[in-house]
Design a protein with these regions (language model features):
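Acidic-leg catalytic submotif of subtilisin-like serine proteases
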Residues: 4-11
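Active-site flanking residues adjacent to catalytic metal/cofactor-binding acidic residues
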Residues: 8, 51, 146
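Metal-dependent catalytic neighborhoods of phosphoester/phosphodiester hydrolases
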Residues: 58-63
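Short catalytic helix/loop segments, enriched in acidic residues and glycine
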Residues: 23-35
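Short glycine-enriched, charge-decorated loop/helix-capping segments at active-site entrances
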Residues: 19-26, 64-70
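Short, glycine/acidic-enriched loop or turn micro-motifs at the edges of active sites
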Residues: 12, 16, 150
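Short beta-strand segments at enzyme active-site cores
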Residues: 45-52
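Active-site-adjacent betaalpha module
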Residues: 1-4, 32-43, 67-176
Length: 176
């Protein structure tokens, strides 16, 4: 088994006070994600950053009703400082909910011979769930770190965790 840690959308616009699309619990799970990153690095596992990245006026904003967020080149599109990628950590941009759709994520993982993904970040019921679903459809084993993901509300967060486990066959895990 070769596992990689995915850090999904831990960007200023989702985490910081006043962020364009702030996720209420994202700052609360930040310390756990910092621990997960340190643990993965200690074990020699790849840490891959999966980051929402939009252009100004991206159709997603009007089509989905989201405010402009994670616009390339803006402070809101940056990974929060306490999780800054290391020099060898891949940063994969995505333009929609799934980290796989239209991105190089699958290639990055296959190059590193990864077969298991440990997911952290936000939003549990959106980008984390869609990335988990696409990972499962591609044959990856999926683990979601329950206390290192944040949803927009607790009900949706819990629903998404159940979907990962009951529908996708993934594992909901805690600290190692």
């Amino acid at each position: 088994m070769r596992r990689a840690l995915l850090v999904i959308d831990m960007l200023e616009d989702f985490v910081a006070e006043g962020g364009a699309l702030r996720v209420p619990d994202a700052a609360a799970v930040l310390p756990r994600i910092v621990e997960e990153v340190a643990d993965a690095r200690r074990r020699g596992e790849p840490v891959v950053y999966v980051c929402d990245a939009h252009t100004p006026g991206d159709p997603e904003f009007s089509r989905m009703g989201w405010p402009p967020h994670a616009v390339r080149g803006t402070p809101g599109a940056r990974v929060v400082p306490s999780l800054a990628p290391g020099p060898y950590d891949p940063v994969v941009e995505k333009t929609t909910y799934s980290g796989f759709h239209g991105s190089r994520l699958d290639a990055v993982l296959r190059e590193r011979l990864v077969d298991t993904l440990r997911l952290t970040g936000c939003v549990t019921n959106i980008c984390v769930l869609y990335t988990a679903a696409d990972a499962a459809m591609r044959g990856y084993a999926v683990e979601v770190v329950e206390d290192a993901v944040a949803g927009l509300d607790p009900r949706d967060h819990e629903w998404a965790l159940r979907q990962v486990q009951e529908v996708l066959g993934g594992r909901i895990v805690g600290r190692q």
